[in-house]
Curated annotation (Swiss-Prot):
Homohexamer. GO terms for biological process: coenzyme A biosynthetic process. This is Phosphopantetheine adenylyltransferase. PANTHER family: PHOSPHOPANTETHEINE ADENYLYLTRANSFERASE. One of its GO terms (molecular function) is ATP binding. InterPro entries: Cyt_trans-like (IPR004821), PPAT (IPR001980), Rossmann-like_a/b/a_fold (IPR014729). Its EC number is 2.7.7.3. The lineage of its organism: Bacteria, Pseudomonadati, Pseudomonadota, Alphaproteobacteria, Caulobacterales.
Amino acid sequence: MRVGLYPGTFDPVTNGHLDIIGRAVKLVDKLVIGVAINIGKGPLFSLEERVEILERETAHLKKIAEIEVRPFDSLLMHFARDVNAQMIVRGLRAVADFEYEFQMTAMNQQLDREIETVFLMADPRHQAIASRLVKEIATLGGDIGKFVPPGVAQQLLAKVGKG
């Protein structure tokens, strides 16, 4: 069984994340979406909310491949081994992403050479989307409808007191 791991904080999940997930499920038999606890980033959504949102927003993809949404707070490569992943899936939006991901991949290869990293280029419609910016736009009362699914927009606007 080909198992891929798509890790992230997903605070909130965006249309860009969902595009990568929708393409990644076509490459594997099972995709584990690893939700990083990452308290250092001070997430707006709780871990439970992020897991629930991802389960809801990816439910329609389960007919393509098995999908499992799991939180993790360990080293990524340890988590990848725990879920028997042969590959880590990462999305690239811009050159800055590539530089960071290149460095992370080099370090991860030192930790486990058996686990490959696969990069998927962001769809041009989603290249500018970043969770941090979506939260900022929502907080300032802007329209986030192009950046996140309707259910996520509703939850985010409620969180920032605009819904």
